[in-house]
Amino acid sequence: MAATALAVRSRIGAWSVWAMQSRGFSSDTPEGVRSGAGAVRDAGGAFGKKEQADEERYFRARAREQLAALKKHHENEISHHVKEIERLQKEIERHKQSIKKLKNDDDD
């Protein structure tokens, strides 16, 4: 039964690769059709300028949001590492005290 399922999966996988190769990619444009046909920006004029301004505004806002999120992520990482450093320094101090105690016990 497992072999049958494996055979079916392999046939489906092979077929899907074949279908992708024969279909091409969605960005391929058919002959006779301009790229971006029907787009408002390509038409020019006031609507095209407004569309371009809106698009640029959107991407600037998106970039600002991404930078703010990245900054917050880095700040969280820094605070995490500072806490980890403090924890490890306490561990080091604890081990030093243990060694000191062992030396004192050994001297007695």
From Swiss-Prot:
Residue segments, region N-terminal inhibitory region: 26-52
BP term (GO), one: positive regulation of type 2 mitophagy
Pfam families linked to this entry: IATP
Subcellular localization(s) per the UniProt record: Mitochondrion
FT transit peptide: 1-25
Single GO cellular component term: mitochondrion
Main location as per UniProt: mitochondrion
Keywords: Coiled coil, Mitochondrion, Transit peptide
Coiled coil: 69-108
Residues covered by region (Disordered): 25-48
Signal peptide: none
Cross-referenced InterPro entries: ATPase_inhibitor_mt (IPR007648)
Molecular function terms from GO: angiostatin binding; ATPase binding; ATPase inhibitor activity; calmodulin binding; identical protein binding; mitochondrial proton-transporting ATP synthase complex binding
Region entry Antiparallel alpha-helical coiled coil region, spans: 74-106
N6-succinyllysine: modified positions: 103
Family: Belongs to the ATPase inhibitor family.
Function: Endogenous F(1)F(o)-ATPase inhibitor limiting ATP depletion when the mitochondrial membrane potential falls below a threshold and the F(1)F(o)-ATP synthase starts hydrolyzing ATP to pump protons out of the mitochondrial matrix. Required to avoid the consumption of cellular ATP when the F(1)F(o)-ATP synthase enzyme acts as an ATP hydrolase. Indirectly acts as a regulator of heme synthesis in erythroid tissues: regulates heme synthesis by modulating the mitochondrial pH and redox potential, allowing FECH to efficiently catalyze the incorporation of iron into protoporphyrin IX to produce heme.
Quaternary structure and interacting proteins, as annotated: Homodimer; represents the active form and is present at a pH value below 6.5. Homotetramer; represents the inactive form and is present at a pH value above 7.0.
Domain notes: Forms an alpha-helical dimer with monomers associated via an antiparallel alpha-helical coiled coil composed of residues 74-106, leaving each N-terminal inhibitory region (residues 26-52) accessible for interaction with an F1 catalytic domain. The inhibitory N-terminal region (residues 26-52) binds the alpha(ADP-bound)-beta(ADP-bound) (ATP5F1A-ATP5F1B) interface of F1-ATPase, and also contact the central gamma subunit (ATP5F1C).
Name the UniProt record assigns to this protein: ATPase inhibitor, mitochondrial
Organism: Sus scrofa (Pig)
Gene name tied to this protein: ATP5IF1
